[in-house]
């Protein structure tokens, strides 16, 4: 089953894949990295002018990384807001996704945090640098295959 936004995008020939609905009935769409910036601009013009949040996660060790965007369209008042979740998957070996900073300014620190923790490079982001970890930090701490430097696990401490 496709949601209204998925049907609207399909009518206009915009490539995407519906991943279904979450427990709140919000549709989740998958967009390819190379299509993401143009579809983001189209969604903004269509009325999704509020980026509620952006996050990223490691799908599986050695697998894909995902950048997730929660967008809201407030056309008929806050009580009737439309929401959509967009997922953009990228390979960890070349984790590059177009930045949507120039579409939604609120993506600034959120994309920087995703870069800092997972190493996803957001192309055309004006200030893409570490935001939580020191600049000298090596690696991406939230990747499932990350090994912390000088970290020793103590077994049976008691």
UniProtKB/Swiss-Prot annotation:
* EC numbers for this chain: 7.1.1.-
Could you tell me the keywords of this UniProt record? Chloroplast, Membrane, NAD, NADP, Plastid, Plastoquinone, Quinone, Thylakoid, Translocase, Transport
So which domain of life are we looking at?
Answer: Eukaryota
Question: Could you tell me where this protein is found in the cell?
Answer: Plastid, Chloroplast thylakoid membrane
Q: Which residues cross the membrane?
A: none
Pfam families documented for this protein: Complex1_30kDa (PF00329)
Query: Catalysed reaction(s)?
Result: a plastoquinone + NADH + (n+1) H(+)(in) = a plastoquinol + NAD(+) + n H(+)(out); a plastoquinone + NADPH + (n+1) H(+)(in) = a plastoquinol + NADP(+) + n H(+)(out)
Give Gene Ontology CC terms: chloroplast thylakoid membrane
The UniProt GO MF terms for this protein read: NADH dehydrogenase (ubiquinone) activity; quinone binding
Query: What PROSITE patterns has UniProt attached to this entry?
Result: COMPLEX1_30K
Described purpose of this protein according to its UniProt entry: NDH shuttles electrons from NAD(P)H:plastoquinone, via FMN and iron-sulfur (Fe-S) centers, to quinones in the photosynthetic chain and possibly in a chloroplast respiratory chain. The immediate electron acceptor for the enzyme in this species is believed to be plastoquinone. Couples the redox reaction to proton translocation, and thus conserves the redox energy in a proton gradient.
Q: Which family is this protein grouped under?
A: Belongs to the complex I 30 kDa subunit family.
Name this protein carries in UniProt: NAD(P)H-quinone oxidoreductase subunit J, chloroplastic
Question: Whose protein is this, by species?
Answer: Aethionema cordifolium
* Lineage start: Eukaryota, Viridiplantae, Streptophyta, Embryophyta, Tracheophyta
Q: Which gene encodes it?
A: ndhJ
